[in-house]
Amino acid sequence: MRRRYALILGLLVLFCLAAFAVLFGEEVFQNYTAKTQRNIELKAHHEFIQSLRKNSSRLGAFSTDGCSGGLSRAWWTLSDRFPAFAKTHEKAPPWETCCLNHDRSYHSAGGATESHESFSLRLSADQALRTCILGTGRRRSADLSATFGLSEDQIRSAYEAIASAMFDAVRIGRLPCIGLPWRWGYGYPPCAVTIVPN
């Protein structure tokens, strides 16, 4: 019964947000959404920083899975099984160094000591990931264009889609204190927070 009410409430919220966007315009809606997301996320960053202070947490050894979500692992498997794939697309995702740099920032939470700083550093790390992937697309566009018979603009568009999807995935799924292994600040002991807007 609770699930049904939660579903109905969720649909009602989505309907209200859509109506808000139509009535007040896309820009106002995006600003409202960004502000709401920031407020929700800042609570998680506050809890994270408080947990670090309270527990005198020390940073653990760096570890990474490459590009998260199983992307690197799947890529490695494809490369091993299909040498032509590896020849064209490399043995690891061409943007894997972007993911490794991103993981380094996430591991240490960028060295943040305040919640607003933590929020800003996380956003900067996610934007740097997106920018790095786009740069990889620009560097590879001529070669891939010749290989696949597509225009360089089409190749860059594909990389824009990849960069946007990865940016959205890390923005949504890697908040601090959510218990996932590759969360913001994953080099520190886990903390927990109930993320509910005020």
Outline where the language-model segments fall.
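Extended terminal accessory/targeting regions
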Residues: 5-10, 18-198
